[in-house]
Amino acid sequence: ASDEDREGEAIAWHLYEVLKLKPENTKRIVFHEITKSAILKAIEQPRDIDINLVNAQQARRILDRIVGFELSPVLWRKVKPALSAGRLQSVAVRLIVEREREIHAFKSEAAYRVTAVFLVPDTDGKLVEMKAELAHRIKTKKEAEAFLNACKGANFAIEDITTRPLKKTPPAPFTTSTLQQEAARKLGYTVAQTMMIAQRLYESGFITYMRTDSVNLSEFATIGSKDAIIKMMGERYVHPRHFETKTKGAQEAHEAIRPTYMENQSIEGTAQEKKLYDLIWKRTIASQMADAELEKTTVTISISSSSEVFTAIGEVIKFDGFLRVYRESYDDENEQEDESNLLPPLKKGQKLEHGPIVATERFTQRPPRYTEASLVRKLEELGIGRPSTYAPTISTIQNREYVEKGNKDGEERMFNVLTLKDQQVKDENHTEITGTEKAKLFPTDTGTVVNDFLTEYFPDILDYNFTASVEKEFDEIAEGEVKWTSILKTFYDQFHPSVENTLAIKTEHKVGERILGEEPETGKPVSVKIGRFGPMAQIGTAEDEEKPRFAQMKKGQSIETITLEEVLELFKLPRTLGEYEGKTVSVGIGRFGPYVLHNKVYVSLPKTMDPMEITLEEAEQLILEKRTKEAERHIRVQ
């Protein structure tokens, strides 16, 4: 009675083999929820072990082992020891490396967004503000100034009003992927955390099996949802519906992730378990609720002195439907629909009085770095991996230090604002912080170098279509359409010679090494590369009479972007700051970042301090702070 998926089927088969069971008295039962009724029903419907599912799992496991066992030694020889490669993890790293390069190559373009405030009488005759925006952006400051000047003394009138009904349909119940994404966005859980909590909920009998790519709900679940909706909100909110699974190569016909009993709106458990259960319950209930009914009004405002038009949009919820229970979140704020406010009463031809008209310089946005949730979504879109592989893949690439999850401080940027008020155009410059990122996935230098090496020598393994087509072949094995051994043989016969050829290639420079120039004083070559403890800089070569000098790179510096000047700065460390308590105080950079060294004690530098600029007084303060902390720790222990 192991889990109802390929891994579960393989476990059942291994038990059958190891225990030497007989086919005539061994039956397999499956259920996707741990409830009395589900288990009794499964016992009434036993079946044999599905050898096709077992073979599909064997094929995946063996193919992934072949890739790992064959590629990892190549990386040890060509890049650095102790590295590993894997079919899914390498493709995930490639996505992150490519996105990083897109970001660095991105050139932001400026344009002016023009907004206006119009003063309109409401039903009581009181003037209220109505915000409107120019239908398109203006490219240059000169054109924006010309437009605002044209608005001086112009007449504004309502040219057209269109009102149309809108419907919003609820999202489908959760699959593994959508649960991981929504739990990250709404609850801040990592992908691995979500799966761990969901596993506990499943084992406690609160939810159905949590590794699934199906959006189907059983009849039992739809009836349970209907009853719960009627009881809580009334008949009008019910709309039973069936969702189609759209995922590429969706696996066996599981059910979506849902509560086992829809009448249980809450459960006993930890705070995290309660939050995740609440999310699953709301999503499931919402999927069986009526559409939200809205009314969208678009008002077009003409300008007597220009062919341009302003547009004001109002959206009113006429019937909340599923929105009463659930609103879906988005990775990118731009994906969210603009929920505008209610517009005042208006009529075609109505003359309008304007308040300030503002042209604000805005910039095109670079592609965002992946979060764990958006990476899962991308892998699913490409048909790479399966519900059981998303979380382990994302954990592996971080554990291997090919990718790190981190925050990025924003940068200050100046932007221009032109304001037409009281027939005068005011020109001002403002500053804003842009590009702040939290919990995003960044490629490390090691990840980038490994990715480039594998992309050059093993393009098939890193190819998105190839990886997705392998998943399709596993599906065909599961359906009994192809032999698993023939797929493995075909793959190995093509893959193994590539490994042999790559090992035989001799290269002049170490993989990932970048020559930046020469040291001015000695003329020796200056390079950066991946060393045993990560990215490092080097002056000189092993062939020189004098040993080469090495320096650890600072956190935030990258092999791809570091300059010769920045590398030469690194060799000014360690530097002596002076003496404290009769002992030398120096500052340097080690494998864990910048440090102060005093009397054989290392003190890490805070992120805000630059090792090139720290003073002796500041270093003394850090030494004293560390001593105080150590003393407090010893007191607490005693």
Residue map of PLM features:
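Short acidic, hydrophobic short linear motifs in intrinsically disordered regions
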Residues: 158-162, 169-184, 207-212, 366-378, ...
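Basic, low-complexity terminal or inter-domain segments flanking catalytic cores
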Residues: 72, 105, 144, 191-192, ...
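Phosphate-backbone binding and catalysis cores of DNA-processing enzymes
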Residues: 1-165, 255-308, 314-318, 474, ...
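Conserved short loop/turn motifs at secondary-structure junctions
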Residues: 1-4, 80-84, 163-172, 182-187, ...
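Metal- or metallocofactor-binding catalytic centers and their adjacent structured scaffolds
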Residues: 138-173, 347-353, 360, 465, ...
